[in-house]
Each structure stands twice: as C-alpha cells, then as structure tokens.
Amino acid sequence: MMRISRTPDPYVYPALTALRASGKFILGALSNTVAFPPGIRDDHGVLFGSELLHPPNAPYANDGTVIADRFDVFISSAHIGLRKPDPKIYELAVRELDAEARRQGLGGVNVGDVLFLDDIGANLKSAKSVGMRTLKVDLGKTEAAVRELEELTGVKLLEGVQDRARL
C-alpha cells in the first residue's frame, strides 16, 4: 500500500504541473501524514521514504521525487500536530497560502479563494465549514475530478494526458 500512495496519479500529477506552470495559482497540499521510523520497507521490500516513485515510462519520470517540491505550500500533519478534519489545520493552510501569495507578489489569499480537493467527506465538510470551496475526488475517478478542476480554473489540464495515462 505504501508504494501505491507514492506513485503519482496519471491525471492529478500532470494537472498539478499544468496549474503550477500557468502561474495563476498558489498550490498547497494539506496531507495527513505519518512519520515512519527508519528501516521500514514497502510491500516490495524497498526501503520506505517520502519520495515519489515515478513509473519509468511516465512522461514525467525525470521530474524530481520530492512531493513537497510540487507545491508552493506543503503542510504535513505529522510535523505540525494537527490532522484533517480539525478546522485549525485548514485555518493554518489559509494563513500559509496567504503568506506565500504575498511573498510571490500576488496579493493575498482569503479563505473563499481556496479550492480544497479531497476524497474524504469529513475533510471536505470541515474545509467547507471554515469557508473554503471544495471538490470531491472520488477514488478511482481522478480523471472526472480533473475535468471539473479544468472547468473551474480555465486551465487545460487534460490535454494529451488521456493517451499517456493509459500506457
């Protein structure tokens, strides 16, 4: 299971790359994480780490492997002592996104500016309760979620992805 969670989704990963390249958005990740002790191995016996495991034939196989580098803001619950769906973690995320937007000279970020994506209803409900907009990403249906994200952002996110995702 740990190996699967480190393999980039064939629709979401290119969408993140396209959103970042557009220069129109501050990208943040809010992840319920675990800090594993040293020496833990995944289901294939590979020493576990936090790096991404790109499939060798993926068009993004030569991208960096540090997931946090794909975002402007990366909040790991294991490192801050809060977990989703605690409203405080969403409030922290808005403060961090706002600070990053200001650092980049993009003005500020208000809670209503944030579009929060998740697959768990309780996390979405909590995000909505603090004022964020939400988008449910159903497991196994990431292409549909990325299509909706494409409509919401006005950025082409699936162009050329369908063929590569089926490799």
Task: Give the residues covered by each predicted segment.
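Short, acidic loop-to-helix structural element flanking the phosphoryl-transfer center
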Residues: 1-31, 39
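Asp-based, Mg2+/Mn2+-dependent phosphohydrolase catalytic module
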Residues: 17, 30, 34-167
